[in-house]
Amino acid sequence: MTANVSGIGSVLQQMQSMAAQASGGVASPTAALAGSGAATASTFASAMKASLDKISGDQQHALGEAQAFEVGAPNVSLNDVMVDMQKANIGFQFGLQVRNKLVSAYNDIMQMSV
C-alpha cells in the first residue's frame, strides 16, 4: 500500500509543478533554463505527452488486472483491481478536465479582439 501512496505523492508533486509553471513561477531547473518560447513549448508538449502516456498506461494496467482477476489468477485480488480501476478513472477524469480548460482558454484567446 505504501507504493500507492508514494505514487499519489509523485502525481501530486507533478500537478503542483505544472500549476507553478502555468502561473509563471519556476518549479524546476528545466523550466528556469527554458528561456525561449520554443523551448517552453517543447517542455509543455513533452509534459502533456508524458501525462497522456501515464493515463494510458494506468488504464492498460487496470484492464490487465481486471482480465487477470476474471480468469482467476491467484495473485490478483478484487481490492487491487478496484483500486487500479479507480486510479485509472481519476487519471482519465483529470486529463479530461485539463483538456476542457485548454479548449476553453484557446476559445477565449481566439475571441479576443486585436
From Swiss-Prot:
Pfam families: FliE
A cellular-component GO term for this protein: bacterial-type flagellum basal body
Protein keywords: Bacterial flagellum
Molecular functions per Gene Ontology: cytoskeletal motor activity; structural molecule activity
Positions in coiled-coil regions: none
Subcellular locations according to the entry: Bacterial flagellum basal body
NCBIfam families in alphabetical order: fliE (TIGR00205)
Name of the featured protein: Flagellar hook-basal body complex protein FliE
Organism (species): Burkholderia lata (strain ATCC 17760 / DSM 23089 / LMG 22485 / NCIMB 9086 / R18194 / 383)
Gene, per the UniProt record: fliE
